[in-house]
């Protein structure tokens, strides 16, 4: 297992995901310094759907409760976890659909879930929407839709990892996931496929390395007599998650 590659990806992915998630927030009139009217029907000239309006209101409420940075970090980490779990499952043939989400069967960055979209059989899949997006050649939008449906379908067997995505985490799913240099592309490029095979401990290493910079920041602050907040306790107390614990989780 190439732990250097895993660390390189995880550390970079945290920064990248927080930035991308935050960028989606801007699209909906939400920044660290300013939040537009929570009841707005449109933001930046874009008319919100009923679902978007509801999700945006939930996001704003969460930010008011926890703070902007904390919420952006939580959403970024949620998607990191989901991407990691999906990659592990597709490589090991654990996805119920047996259709890869990130690559084709040769491990090329050509998601099989897109090429097989009209043949998919997943709970919650609106085939009419699939055809509509395919006919309009909205590949990126189609991919995001299929990704969300796949996560929701996995809720039945892994409810802890794949909670139903009907809230602001869907709203903040980053754009351009199919581009060169995206988090998904880099995950495939940097971490050898063999490292995912039957080695569930990779999830533990990803977790540890993802939080490593934050952990360093927390302890650096401690040396300056800055107390650890409840939000930073997980990063400060993290330990490597061995194989048997990951399987139990």
Regions found by a protein language model. Name each.
Residues 1-248:
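Preference for the N-terminal adenyl/adenosyl cofactor-binding alpha/beta module
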């Amino acid at each position: 297992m190439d732990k250097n590659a895993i660390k390189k990806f995880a550390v970079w992915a945290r920064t990248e995901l927080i930035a991308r998630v935050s960028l989606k927030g801007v699209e909906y009139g939400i920044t660290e310094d300013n939040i537009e009217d929570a009841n707005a029907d449109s933001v930046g000239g874009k008319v919100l759907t009923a679902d978007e309006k509801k999700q945006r209101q939930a996001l704003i409420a969460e930010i008011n409760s926890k703070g902007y940075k904390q919420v952006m970090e939580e959403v970024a980490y949620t998607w990191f976890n989901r991407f990691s779990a999906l990659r592990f499952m597709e490589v090991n043939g654990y996805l119920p659909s047996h259709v890869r989400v990130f690559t084709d069967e040769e491990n090329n960055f050509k998601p099989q879930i897109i090429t097989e979209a009209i043949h998919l059989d997943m709970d919650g899949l609106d085939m009419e929407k699939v055809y509509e997006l395919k006919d309009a050649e909205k590949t990126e939008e189609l991919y995001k839709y299929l990704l969300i449906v796949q996560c929701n379908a996995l809720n039945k067997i892994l409810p802890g990892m794949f909670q139903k995505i009907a809230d602001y985490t869907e709203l903040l799913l980053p754009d351009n996931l199919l581009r060169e240099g995206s988090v998904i592309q880099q995950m495939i490029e940097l971490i050898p496929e063999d490292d995912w095979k039957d080695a569930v401990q990779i999830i533990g290493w990803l977790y540890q390395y993802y939080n490593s910079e934050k952990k360093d920041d927390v302890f650096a602050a401690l040396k300056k007599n800055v107390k650890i907040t409840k939000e930073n306790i997980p990063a400060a107390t993290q330990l490597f998650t061995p194989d048997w614990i990951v399987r139990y989780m």
